[in-house]
Amino acid sequence: MASATRLIQRLRNWASGHDLQAKLQLRYQEISKRTQPPPKLPVGPSHKLSNNYYCTRDGRRESVPPSIIMSSQKALVSGKPAESSAVAATEKKAVTPAPPIKRWELSSDQPYL
């Protein structure tokens, strides 16, 4: 439309009801300005504007398991047996899903197998 003659421009403007040539310079009105004000973020784990990586913005990383302040049950100290247990502590073997594997013996007639 910018290369149309004056007669065609006026005909188009009259048919559309408004000036189409005035709009050509400002056709991108929804473009944001180059200088933006800094965002107003609420105070929290991601309120910093720089040095704000994704892994540190995740609020789940700041949660910790609950700390036990007081318990009605007596906790055992690790490495010491309970005082009330009358059974002697025996050394326990590791639990395996099958019986132990038998060691194969090499045949004496063919020593290289």
Curated annotation (Swiss-Prot):
Main localisation: mitochondrion
Keywords: Acetylation, Electron transport, Membrane, Mitochondrion, Mitochondrion inner membrane, Phosphoprotein, Respiratory chain, Transport
Membrane topology field: Peripheral membrane protein
Coiled coil: none
A Gene Ontology term for the protein's cellular component: mitochondrial inner membrane
Residue(s) carrying Phosphothreonine: 96
Record keyword Ribonucleoprotein present: no
UniProt-listed InterPro entries: NDUA7 (IPR009947)
Pfam hit, one: CI-B14_5a
Subcellular location: Mitochondrion inner membrane
Residue numbers carrying N6-acetyllysine: 40
Segments for region (Disordered): 31-51, 86-113
Any Gene Ontology biological process: mitochondrial electron transport, NADH to ubiquinone
Modified residues (N-acetylalanine): 2
Similarity comment: Belongs to the complex I NDUFA7 subunit family.
Chain's role: Accessory subunit of the mitochondrial membrane respiratory chain NADH dehydrogenase (Complex I), that is believed not to be involved in catalysis. Complex I functions in the transfer of electrons from NADH to the respiratory chain. The immediate electron acceptor for the enzyme is believed to be ubiquinone.
Subunit structure: Complex I is composed of 45 different subunits.
Name of the protein described by the UniProt record: NADH dehydrogenase [ubiquinone] 1 alpha subcomplex subunit 7
Source organism of the structure: Gorilla gorilla gorilla
Source species taxonomy: Eukaryota, Metazoa, Chordata, Craniata, Vertebrata
